[in-house]
């Protein structure tokens, strides 16, 4: 099933835009409104699964927290394991960490050291692509553990912020269902 223009428009219309959130001048794309619509939520998962069902994926990695909401059902439908990447001190077993830059400072992500095996073919899934910093850090974690990442999939791509170009430079192909301007 290839995504039709009508299906993609349905998904786009299910995402509410909130002006001046979280601060003045920002137009926030609220993917939680898509989750409230079971038809839209199911369709978003179906379209991602369709794209990757024959790609040889062995693990799906989702980033905290909304990446879990899309990554886990994609992994389940593909019949592969799901691996969460989380903020520091949220995972109980031994982890490795990767820092990344925020607008005002840095943050860190962690992954269990035994979650990815050398040679795993990994799909990274998140709700939204903006600057690409979170996904870049996630890819570094996966690669440090020997996993191969070639694709990252998103529901929303804020296409004019530059995240896709940033990830393409790291050898990551980006796929998104719904493009929006970032400003």
From Swiss-Prot:
One of its GO terms (cellular component) is cytosol. Transmembrane segments: none annotated. It is found in: Cytoplasm. Signal peptide: none annotated. Keywords: Cytoplasm, Glycosyltransferase, Purine salvage, Transferase. Its EC number is 2.4.2.7. It comes from the Bacteria. The keyword Cytoplasm applies. Gene3D superfamilies: 3.40.50.2020. It catalyses: AMP + diphosphate = 5-phospho-alpha-D-ribose 1-diphosphate + adenine. Pathway: Purine metabolism; AMP biosynthesis via salvage pathway; AMP from adenine: step 1/1. The keyword Ion transport does not apply. InterPro entries: Ade_phspho_trans (IPR005764), Adenine_PRTase (IPR050120), PRibTrfase_dom (IPR000836), PRTase-like (IPR029057). GO terms for biological process: adenine salvage; AMP salvage; purine ribonucleoside salvage. Belongs to the purine/pyrimidine phosphoribosyltransferase family. HAMAP family: Aden_phosphoribosyltr. Homodimer. Catalyzes a salvage reaction resulting in the formation of AMP, that is energically less costly than de novo synthesis. This is Adenine phosphoribosyltransferase. The gene is apt.
């Amino acid at each position: 099933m290839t995504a039709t223009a009508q299906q993609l428009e349905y998904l786009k219309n299910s995402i509410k835009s909130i002006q001046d959130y979280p601060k003045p001048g920002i137009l926030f794309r609220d993917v939680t409104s898509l989750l409230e619509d079971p038809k839209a939520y199911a369709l978003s998962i179906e379209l991602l699964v369709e794209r990757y069902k024959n790609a040889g994926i062995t693990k799906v990695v989702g980033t905290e927290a909304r990446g879990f909401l899309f990554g886990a059902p994609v992994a389940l439908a593909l019949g592969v394991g799901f691996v969460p990447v989380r903020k520091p001190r949220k995972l109980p077993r031994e982890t490795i960490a990767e820092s990344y830059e925020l607008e005002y400072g840095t943050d860190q992500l962690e992954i269990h050291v035994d979650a990815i095996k050398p040679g795993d073919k990994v799909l990274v899934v998140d709700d939204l692509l903006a600057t690409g910093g979170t996904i870049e850090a996630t890819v570094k974690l996966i690669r440090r553990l020997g996993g191969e990442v070639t694709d990252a999939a998103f529901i929303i791509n804020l296409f004019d912020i530059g995240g896709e170009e940033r990830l393409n430079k790291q050898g990551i192909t980006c796929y998104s269902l719904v493009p929006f301007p970032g400003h």
